[in-house]
């Protein structure tokens, strides 16, 4: 709450203390997400894809990933998922989640398909003393002569480049998908909860002024 003109420190502290904040946004998001996930999704996919969904990316089960994606789309307007694979076979595939703020740059073709995506990551690596330290790195996904290529660069400008394979073959598209309030796509859409956030803030300020 901003300090009102002429308020002393004591008056300003009392002004803040008497204001009541009721988390309308938090309760609404929790309720809407709960409604969306109460029923199991109908999944039509090959067995290997079903197995992929049962694997836990970064400790997240598929249901948890679904819950997180729904919350993020409501609160910040987007959520990214990378279907990742090292230079191996199908059984090595994993799903990597990315928050909105980690999707820092991208380009798409005329059909809206990504041709370039840059992601920000924080990984915890051993520091040599038995502890771990947070390391910032950037993952760049692009098509090089029509082949999906991944380059990872850390803060020391050390880079590693691979061409992931699925079923032993390189692929000709970038397997990164962004969910937004209107479906799948990289377009920046209006955050669903922004109007309710503004109303919640207005109620909070009115409470401070009138109570």
Please provide the spans of the model-predicted regions.
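Extended, Lys/Arg-enriched charged tracts that mediate electrostatic binding to polyanionic substrates
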Residues: 67-162
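Extended, charged amphipathic alpha-helical segments
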Residues: 160-211
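Small/flexible residues
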Residues: 5, 20, 29, 134, ...
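Extended, helix-rich architectural segments
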Residues: 1-95
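Generic low-polarity alpha-helical segments
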Residues: 21-24, 32-33, 148-150, 200, ...
């Amino acid at each position: 709450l901003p300090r009102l003109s002429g308020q002393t420190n004591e008056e300003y502290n009392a002004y803040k203390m008497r204001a009541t904040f009721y988390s309308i946004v938090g309760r609404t998001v929790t309720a809407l997400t709960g409604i969306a996930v109460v029923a199991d999704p109908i999944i039509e996919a090959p067995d290997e894809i079903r197995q992929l969904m049962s694997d836990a990316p970064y400790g997240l089960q598929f249901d948890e990933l679904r819950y997180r994606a729904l919350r993020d789309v409501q609160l910040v307007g987007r959520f990214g998922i990378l279907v990742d694979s090292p230079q191996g076979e199908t059984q090595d595939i994993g799903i990597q989640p990315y928050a909105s703020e980690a999707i820092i740059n991208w380009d798409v073709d005329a059909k809206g398909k990504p041709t370039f995506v840059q992601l920000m990551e924080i990984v915890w690596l051993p520091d040599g003393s038995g502890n771990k330290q947070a390391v910032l790195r950037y993952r760049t996904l692009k098509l090089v002569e029509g082949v999906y290529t991944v380059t990872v660069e850390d803060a020391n400008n050390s880079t590693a480049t691979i061409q992931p394979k699925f079923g032993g073959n390189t692929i000709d598209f970038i397997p990164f998908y962004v969910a937004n309030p209107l479906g799948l796509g990289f377009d920046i859409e209006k955050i669903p909860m922004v109007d309710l956030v503004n109303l919640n803030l207005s109620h909070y300020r009115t409470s401070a002024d009138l109570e």
